[in-house]
Amino acid sequence: KPGIPVGVPKGKALELRDFQHWSDTLLAKYPHALQSNDEAPDAVEVYRKTLAAQPDKSVTIVTVGFLTNLGNLLQSKADKYSSLSGKQLVKKKVKILVCMAGMFPSGSEFNVNRDASASQQVYNNWPTPVLLSGFEIGQKIHTGLPLINNSSIVNSPVKDVFRISIPLDKQDSAGRMSWDETAVLVAVKGYKPWYKLERGKMIVADNGSNTWDTTKKNHAQLPGAPPQSIVRDSSLLYPMYCC
């Protein structure tokens, strides 16, 4: 979909290389307006501009990666888009934050531990409801193979990523584990009828590991094994690849 604002972190941020090289393929195959990160605006500016223009309590933010940009957003100051601080702006405009993050009831998960300070900033200070889809939720739901085998879908960046990456990892032989997709599913369609919520609070240690404090109710997570309806019918996630 064209016209989606894109921002990048302009300060300290992780740099990870794509060892499977699907990103190289996408850049070579598909047109794109930005030639480098230097041409993109600061992600915090994109967030502030976008949030300021939305109705109050109307925005669902879904994150399927590191919390770097959201941590920076919370610490941002008033600017030309809003007289509110980052935390005030989030509280006014955001309805819920949905995250693919953490491992429950405890563990160490990639999206949280690689930028532990940003994760602590977000989970200690985010002023709206937070819903977490943990590692264990997407681990048993495999997707991608139906998309790869569907010859009617052409010129699809998402299909290309699955086509390139799945054969390169033995654990993906039955399909890619669907960590990010499950978070997007509940962000777009809600957690019902597939899940119930468990209230608590995500606690992130300095080393990036996490625990779940059931005595507090700031956050919610999707407990237990994924419903068999999702495991059996990954077409619940399939439309995300085609839109």
What are these regions (language model features)?
Residues 1-243:
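N-terminal acidic, glycine/proline-rich low-complexity segments
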